[in-house]
């Protein structure tokens, strides 16, 4: 099976690094998916969520305010100005990281419809856990 390695890095450090099945990125021209063996690409990313699917078909999400994606030879590297990995071992930790993610995206998004759609998608992924 072909592998796809994802790394998400901010000026504060690494937020995520693991092998994944696929990833959906918030490109400047719209969302796009990346699978193993994707063509090489560099893209500007807008404020939104990165939807990460692991080999067990579970989804994780990382909210970013903006950044760049470099896709090359089975590896996706995201350089983001700010990122929040929405995760937690308890309901309160998960709710806290979700609130941080909402604030991060809201601080960068001037489009209220896009912001509402992004928040709804984030909440749906969290509920599905």
Curated annotation (Swiss-Prot):
Disulfide bonds: none annotated. CDD domains: F1-ATPase_delta. Keywords: ATP synthesis, Cell inner membrane, Cell membrane, CF(1), Hydrogen ion transport, Ion transport, Membrane, Transport. SUPFAM superfamilies: Epsilon subunit of F1F0-ATP synthase N-terminal domain. Pfam families: ATP-synt_DE_N. Coiled coil: none annotated. It is found in: Cell inner membrane. Belongs to the ATPase epsilon chain family. Produces ATP from ADP in the presence of a proton gradient across the membrane. F-type ATPases have 2 components, CF(1) - the catalytic core - and CF(0) - the membrane proton channel. CF(1) has five subunits: alpha(3), beta(3), gamma(1), delta(1), epsilon(1). CF(0) has three main subunits: a, b and c. This is ATP synthase epsilon chain.
């Amino acid at each position: 099976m072909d592998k796809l390695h994802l790394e998400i890095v901010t000026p504060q450090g690494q937020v995520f690094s693991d092998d994944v099945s696929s990833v959906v990125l918030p490109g400047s021209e719209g969302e796009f998916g990346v699978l193993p063996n994707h063509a090489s690409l560099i893209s500007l990313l807008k404020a939104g969520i990165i939807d990460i699917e692991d080999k067990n078909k579970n989804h994780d999400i990382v909210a970013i305010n903006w950044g760049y994606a470099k896709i090359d030879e089975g590896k996706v590297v995201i350089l983001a100005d700010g990122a929040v990995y929405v995760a937690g071992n308890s309901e309160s930790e998960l709710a806290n990281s979700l609130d941080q993610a909402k604030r991060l995206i809201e601080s960068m998004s001037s489009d209220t419809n896009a912001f509402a759609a992004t928040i709804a998608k984030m909440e749906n992924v969290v509920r599905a856990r």
